[in-house]
């Protein structure tokens, strides 16, 4: 952090400590994720897919640190991947059921791209928003938005 922000190490340490003081549940999540990984040898996504971490108990601090970062990140990133895949299947099925000609053509992280017929645009938007926001029920709402354009740049 000190290097990235071009600030003294002591100041970056204060920023990090202040962050975790403000958001203690994040530190608790991180610690718990590492502990679970050390006990089980893996972490899980929201749909129980496993990410095995064979180096989580390594004696090499660099190797272990990499595995610990994966123990923290994999459940979050993997769960996001799980959720978008559920939404994609549901969107595809709705398009089929409703006889739409528009097609899903690309997924990039948390984005979906479609080729949409103009006369189907509003229906496609409604389906996509509904399925993206309701792919799973969480304690916090999933919020989606739609952009449109003749190319990806315009759609953003």
Annotate each PLM feature.
Residues 2-156:
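Conserved catalytic core of nucleotide polymerization and phosphodiester-bond processing enzymes
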């Amino acid at each position: 952090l000190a290097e990235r922000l071009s600030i003294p190490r002591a100041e970056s340490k204060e920023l990090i400590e202040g962050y975790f003081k403000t958001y203690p549940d994040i530190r608790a999540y991180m610690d718990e994720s590492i502990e679970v990984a050390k006990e089980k040898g893996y972490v899980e996504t929201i749909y129980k897919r496993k990410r095995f971490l064979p180096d989580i108990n390594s004696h090499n601090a660099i190797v272990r640190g990499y595995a610990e970062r994966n123990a923290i990140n994999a459940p979050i990133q993997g769960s996001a991947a799980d959720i978008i895949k559920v939404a994609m299947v549901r969107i595809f099925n709705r398009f089929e059921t409703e006889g739409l000609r528009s097609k899903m053509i690309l997924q990039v992280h948390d984005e979906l791209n479609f080729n949409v017929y103009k006369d189907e645009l509003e229906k496609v938007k409604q389906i996509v928003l509904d399925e993206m926001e309701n792919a799973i029920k969480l304690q916090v709402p999933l919020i989606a938005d739609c952009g449109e354009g003749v190319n990806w740049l315009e759609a953003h």
